[in-house]
Amino acid sequence: MAKEKFVRSKPHLNVGTIGHIDHGKTTLTAAITKYLSLFGRADYTPYEQIDKAPEEKERGITINIAHIEYETEKRHYAHIDCPGHADYIKNMITGAAQMDGAILVVAATDGPMPQTREHVLLARQVNVPAMIVFINKTDMVDDEELVDLVEMEVRELLNKYEFPGDDLPVIRGSALKAVEASNDPNDEAYAPIKELLDTMDEYFPEPQRETDKPFLMPVEDVFSITGRGTVVTGRIERGVIRPGDEVEIVGMSYEVNKTVVTSVEMFRKILDEGLAGDNVGCLLRGIDKDEVERGQVLAKPGSITPHTTFKAQVYVLKKEEGGRHTPFQKGYKPQFFIRTADVTGELIEFPAGVEMVMPGDNVEMTIKLIYPVAIEEGMRFAIREGGRTVGAGVVTAIVE
């Protein structure tokens, strides 16, 4: 089948199902595609197909992620579902597939379980903007009061992790009943699926487009062009850059250099503007080649500052994933790959009661770099040692 052109007529959102193993995340994903396929807005993707998700590599880490797409009357969705618990952790920390909204699936038969909590904590740490709860398997619980109890527990859990637990939408239903339902879209088994989709359309906020955010471009390379000046190249991470725009060069020291971009070029052609996602060269006014280097960023003035010390949620690779074979303690000094920067840092603090971190752990820690780098909350990074990736992290708070 030929690749269809992606038509941007509707707002696009990235969403995903999260929750404890066997609570029905994948069945719910299948049910959504089945229901929408009756209107020609999705290809029905059965459980087995989603479950054997292909492998992807992100920051040197292998993750299994299934990408499903569908649309409602109002929106276009890219939906991710991960087969294994570790895949969810790795996905959320590396940001392989970021979420504009999450659907937390909780089985009425079990209530919130350990992985439910871990996924909610991660959603908070990586700032998933909104959450909807789907209480699944309600057909297997005879007593409605038990479902009320599960709902109460889930709302309490969400409050604990600073989601609006008292106010956010909770939908009850059976994903399996919808998957097994007839091809009549009015079949009552589809009612909770329709309710979920309507709620997603209304409740998940529309994400800010990358081009509307303040300009930022990590510096990949620096050239000196005789008679013209210094050109830095890189891929624009967010925002827009136009000739004449003032930018700051941030990172490597606490001092921030200001300059003006006098020309933006792509494939040797002069551009009116460079947009998020473009690989460009920016000519900088009055900057010598030795005043800017790989690892720094060009950014809209005042939009990002250099820091050395931050808190992060880190996933430590298992031996089987190519990670370390042994645990590490405070004082461990690996390399941190932050955008294009490659900088040594020290692990200076673990949570209370944690003496050492084992391969396979998912843990919060405080990191101190040997020199300042442009850092912000929600930013992803890799931890490497001796040429191999040993961990992946996301910045949860700036310390200094």
UniProtKB/Swiss-Prot annotation:
One of its GO terms (molecular function) is GTPase activity. The keyword Acyltransferase does not apply. GO terms for cellular component: cytosol. Residues 19-26 are annotated as: G1. Residues 10-208 form the tr-type G domain. It is found in: Cytoplasm. It is an enzyme of class 3 (hydrolase). It catalyses: GTP + H2O = GDP + phosphate + H(+). Its EC number is 3.6.5.3. Keywords: Cytoplasm, Elongation factor, GTP-binding, Hydrolase, Magnesium, Metal-binding, Nucleotide-binding, Protein biosynthesis. Pfam families: GTP_EFTU (PF00009), GTP_EFTU_D2 (PF03144), GTP_EFTU_D3 (PF03143). Belongs to the TRAFAC class translation factor GTPase superfamily. Classic translation factor GTPase family. EF-Tu/EF-1A subfamily. This is Elongation factor Tu. It comes from Thermosipho melanesiensis (strain DSM 12029 / CIP 104789 / BI429).
